[in-house]
């Protein structure tokens, strides 16, 4: 008798392997560098011209292997997958990820929105292949993957959403143009924030200081991992380290977007769908709980929950998460 997807996922989770705690115990933090177990620099880096905006693209794995696309969340960058992506690549995939515009090493564009990010994603994907491929997204990247799956279902064989599942609540890491209601105080607050950063760059600090700032939003992630992220997601200048994130971006925003729109479209996904949900709520998470999704999963959909894990499932339990994803897309 053929095992169900849920049964097969339970089997691979049982051999989950290393957790963040295991890996962090063996990390080595220097003054300006960090060695983190299993982290791998991308095998290839290139740029995609997305209608005049340069998008930094990163790849792990054999260039001749079938592609698997990986999308990061808001206030993040592709190198946050330096542990997770190589694990997927070891499963026989050419893993392709990229920095969203105004994130990481992609160009800082004067205009940014989820619609612009979607266009950039399509440009990257079509630059790599015209063959249908799996797509995996975390947080905002997961929500973007849902939109791509709804708009271009012929391009994707499987869709995995890592803790970016919609509910009736507003998402915390959307950009400033994507708010539930256009309120005067929100608009005024955004303009005040813009005026307060005339130099157009983020506050500098030491490597430990930047890791500590990130820990305020990601309290479940280890200091060792956050320190590693500084070395791959910040630039080191004469006055210290600065995150390579648009200084105009901040939590929240304003505009017409409503989270229920994504939720209402979820049942219509035609490809096999896997949702991964961490049950420990935290600031960067979406606050979605399993009951929010009851009746909304697509016909070929499966929801897998992780007890004792927060928003960054693939960082807290990278080996287990990679095993579950590889089992699903295979």
Predicted regions and their residues:
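Conserved loop-alpha-helix segment in the C-terminal half of the alpha/beta-hydrolase fold
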Residues: 267-309
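Conserved HGGG/HGGXW glycine-rich cap/lid loop of the alpha/beta-hydrolase fold
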Residues: 58-105
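Alpha/beta-hydrolase
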Residues: 200-281
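Flexible "cap/lid" loop of the alpha/beta hydrolase fold
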Residues: 150, 157-203
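Post-His helix in hydrolase/transferase enzymes
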Residues: 315-327
């Amino acid at each position: 008798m053929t095992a169900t997807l849920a049964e097969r996922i339970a089997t691979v989770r049982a051999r989950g392997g290393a957790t963040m705690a295991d890996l962090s115990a063996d990390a080595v933090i220097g003054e300006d560098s960090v060695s983190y177990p299993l982290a791998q620099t991308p095998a290839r880096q290139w740029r995609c011209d997305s209608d005049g905006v340069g998008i930094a693209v990163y790849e792990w794995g054999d260039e001749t292997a079938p592609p698997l696309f990986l999308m990061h969340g808001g206030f993040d960058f592709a190198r946050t997958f330096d542990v997770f992506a190589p694990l997927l690549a070891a499963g026989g995939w050419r893993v392709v990820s990229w920095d969203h515009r105004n994130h990481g090493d992609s160009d800082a564009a004067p205009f940014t929105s989820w619609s612009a990010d979607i266009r950039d994603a399509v440009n990257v994907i079509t630059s790599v292949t015209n063959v249908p491929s799996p797509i995996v997204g975390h947080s905002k990247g997961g929500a973007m993957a849902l939109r791509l799956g709804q708009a271009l279902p012929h391009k994707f064989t499987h869709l995995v959403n890592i803790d970016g599942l919609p509910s009736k609540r507003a998402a915390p890491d959307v950009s400033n143009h994507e708010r539930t209601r256009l309120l005067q105080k929100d608009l005024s607050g955004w303009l005040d924030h813009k005026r307060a950063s005339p130099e157009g760059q983020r506050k500098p600090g030491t490597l430990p200081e930047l890791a500590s700032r990130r820990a305020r939003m990601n309290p479940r992630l280890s200091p060792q991992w956050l320190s590693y992220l500084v070395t791959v997601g910040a630039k080191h200048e004469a006055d210290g380290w600065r995150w390579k994130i648009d200084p105009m971006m901040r939590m929240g925003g304003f505009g017409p977007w409503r989270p229920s729109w994504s939720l209402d479209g979820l049942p219509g996904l035609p490809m096999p769908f896997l949702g991964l949900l961490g049950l420990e709520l935290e600031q960067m998470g979406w606050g979605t709980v399993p009951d929010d999704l009851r009746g909304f999963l697509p016909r070929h959909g499966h929801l897998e929950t992780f007890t004792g894990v927060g928003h960054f499932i693939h960082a807290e339990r990278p080996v287990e998460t990679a095993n579950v994803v590889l089992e699903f897309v295979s």
